[in-house]
């Protein structure tokens, strides 16, 4: 089974991202806008309970925090992904580090850059044009974060929530 671990921002932030994703992200229909804590990984069904238990432990060790989302960035020239930048807080860093050690042994493909994807798979010309236009706009949002989610991928490629983990001691 394929799993991923994400934070979903507020509906307002998701709506803003989806307004752009409809046009610029071919994965728009597969998963709502999110901040990836751990990229998708394969696991055996019998490992799921251990993963869930580990995520409850990680959530209990992490305090709720404020998510700051703003400005548009890009991963070019590595790939033509456009995103809303997410401020890297100590809590986000801790969550990401905890999800890449211990039970989670998958190698990182990229350094952790918290972000909210708004476009991908664009040609170089389209990427440059859209990035130029979006960088002139003013985006800034913040919201409290008190949970993250374990997702699994369905046969049709869409992602759905398996379990939600509340941050802070006594919340799980």
Curated annotation (Swiss-Prot):
Per the annotation, the residue ranges of the short sequence motif HXTX 1 are 34-37
Give one Pfam family, short name only: 2_5_RNA_ligase2
Q: Provide the E.C. number(s) assigned to this enzyme.
A: 3.1.-.-
Single annotated GO MF: hydrolase activity, acting on ester bonds
Q: Which residues form a coiled coil?
A: none
List, from the UniProt record, the residues annotated as the active site of this protein: 34, 115
Which EC class is this protein assigned? hydrolase
The organism's place on the tree of life at top rank: Bacteria
The UniProt entry, under InterPro entries, shows: 2H_phosphoesterase_YjcG-like, Cyclic_Pdiesterase, YjcG
Q: Which UniProt keywords apply?
A: Hydrolase
* Placement of sequence motif HXTX 2: 115-118
Note the NCBIfam families from the entry: PRK13679.1 (NF010223)
Family named by the database record: Belongs to the 2H phosphoesterase superfamily. YjcG family.
PANTHER family, per the entry: PHOSPHOESTERASE SAOUHSC_00951-RELATED (PTHR40037:SF1), PHOSPHOESTERASE YJCG-RELATED (PTHR40037)
Protein name as annotated: Putative phosphoesterase BCG9842_B4061
Please report the organism this UniProt entry assigns to the protein: Bacillus cereus (strain G9842)
> Could you read off the lineage of the organism from its UniProt record?
Bacteria, Bacillati, Bacillota, Bacilli, Bacillales
């Amino acid at each position: 089974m394929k799993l991923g671990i994400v934070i979903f921002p507020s509906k307002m932030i998701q709506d803003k991202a989806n307004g752009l994703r409809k046009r610029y992200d071919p994965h728009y229909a597969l998963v709502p806008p999110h901040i990836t804590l751990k990229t998708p990984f394969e696991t055996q069904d019998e490992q799921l309970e251990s993963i869930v238990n580990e995520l409850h432990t990680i959530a209990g060790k992490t305090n709720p925090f404020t998510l700051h989302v703003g400005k548009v960035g890009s991963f070019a020239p590595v790939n033509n992904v456009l995103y809303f930048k997410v401020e890297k807080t100590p809590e986000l860093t801790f969550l990401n580090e905890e999800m890449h050690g211990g039970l989670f042994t998958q190698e990182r493909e990229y350094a952790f850059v918290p972000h909210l994807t708004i476009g991908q798979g664009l040609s170089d010309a389209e990427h440059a044009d859209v990035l130029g236009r979006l960088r002139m706009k003013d985006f800034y949002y913040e919201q409290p974060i008190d949970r993250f989610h374990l997702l699994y991928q369905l046969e049709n490629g869409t992602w759905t929530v398996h379990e939600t983990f509340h941050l802070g001691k006594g919340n799980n």
